[in-house]
Every structure is written in C-alpha cells, then in structure tokens.
Curated annotation (Swiss-Prot):
The keyword Isomerase applies. Substrate binds at residues 8-15, 21-22, 58, 110-113, 121, 137-138, 181-182. It is an enzyme of class 5 (isomerase). One of its GO terms (molecular function) is phosphoglycerate mutase activity. InterPro entries: His_Pase_superF_clade-1, His_PPase_superfam, PG/BPGM_mutase_AS, Phosphogly_mut1. This is 2,3-bisphosphoglycerate-dependent phosphoglycerate mutase. The keyword Isomerase applies. It comes from Pseudoalteromonas atlantica (strain T6c / ATCC BAA-1087).
C-alpha cells in the first residue's frame, strides 16, 4: 500500500488579484502563506518518502512549508529534471539515504495561458466576452491564444505522472505532489478515471490536500480531502 498526496499551492498574489497566472513565476500572497502553513499542520504527522513539484515558486514554497513542519522529514535534496541522463548521478552516503528527494519538473507546471497571462479575468471578459473566456478556462480542448488547452496540459502532466510517480507508488512509497490547479486536475482525471467534462467542472481549492491510498496495481482504495 502507498499514499499519494496531491496539493495545489496556496493562494498566489495573482490569484488574489484575479489574474491569469500560468507560467508567470509569482509568489504566494500572505493568505497563501497561511494556507500553506495550515496544510502543513494537517500533514505534519504524514510520512513522505519523496516529493515532486513544478519549476514555479508558488508550488515550491508551499511544498517547503509542508516539509518544514513535517515531523518525519528532517532534510531533503532537490533534483532538477533537466532531461539529461546525468541529472541524478551522485553517490549517496548512508546519511544522505535518509534525505527526502524533491524532484522538480516543468511538466508539472500550471497550464500555459499564453496571451491571457497577467490579464485580470474580469478585464478579459470585457475584452472577449463571458462565453469566450469561459470556453478558454473550462473547455478541455480549446486553448487560449498562444496558450495550452487543458488537454495539452494533461498530456505532459500525465506522462510525467506515469513515468516518474507511478513507479514510486508501486514500490510502496508515500509520495507528495505539490503543483497547480490544472496539472493536478489532469492527474486526478487520470487516476479517478473521470471524463473530460467531469474534470473541466472539477474545482481544486488552494492548499487542500487530496490523499489517495492505492495498491501496486494503482487501484484507488480510498480518498480523503482535507479542508
């Protein structure tokens, strides 16, 4: 048995300002820091064997807040996914074997919103109309100008999940993934076998842990959402 914990980052400054964020590397708001601290308290007793996060600061800061308060994790090492076969090549000492490894990958980044990035969502509705903005935000296959659709985001996020995260879960490890609303919705769609319509309507709150218990066949045995 293994545990998979998925958590969206705490509120960012641009979340607070109701702006499309995407790959813009904005920090957590004060409320977002408090949300991350609250999630950290909820997960303080949970043992994690390894963690995964995106290249974006808001996800990483949420992850570090969780690990800082975790009573089972005392030290960790970051490993960047550079695409090179050598990126993880190092000899671990006995002490380093106790370190929690954090894998950082662009494939877990938020959906890329293209020309909408930085634009206030209410302003976008004024410019393009409610229906068009709703389609860009909630349809599965339609991408905003020069951006990604949810389907495109799902392709990269699920591929990374299958190649990097599933093998760890099948070894019985407890995994923490701290990422973004759309990359995590894609993973949730995959593991819960949701339809495109179901995941398009699925709301994922900031800093609200989703904890799945699964077996080696990746069957979901239980799900718990902490709020």
């Amino acid at each position: 048995m293994s545990l998979l914990t998925l958590i969206r980052h705490g509120q960012s400054i641009w979340n607070q300002q109701n702006r499309f964020t995407g790959w813009v590397d904005v920090s957590l708001s004060q409320s977002g820091v408090k949300e991350a601290q609250r999630a950290a308290q909820m997960l303080s007793q949970q043992r994690f064997d390894l963690a995964f996060t995106s290249e974006l600061l808001r996800a990483q800061d949420t992850l570090y807040e969780i690990l800082r308060h975790n009573r089972q994790c005392h030290q960790y090492v970051r490993i960047h996914d550079t695409g090179s076969q050598w990126y993880e090549h190092f000899e671990a000492s006995p002490a380093e074997e106790l370190e929690l490894r954090i894998y950082v990958s662009q494939q877990l980044n938020e959906r890329y919103y293209g020309d909408l990035q930085g634009l206030n969502k209410d302003k976008a509705r004024q410019l393009f109309g409610d229906e068009q903005v709703h389609t860009w935000r909630r349809s599965y296959n339609v991408a905003p100008p020069n951006g990604e659709s949810l389907a495109m985001t799902a392709t990269r996020a699920i591929a990374y999940f299958q190649s990097h995260i599933v093998p760890a879960l099948q070894q019985g490890k407890n995994v923490l993934v701290c990422a973004h609303g759309n990359s995590l919705r894609a993973i949730i769609m995959h593991i819960e076998k949701m339809t495109a319509a179901q995941i398009a309507a699925y709301e994922l709150k900031t800093a609200s842990p989703h904890i799945y218990q699964c077996n080696t066949a990746m069957d979901i045995l239980s799900k718990q959402v902490l709020e």
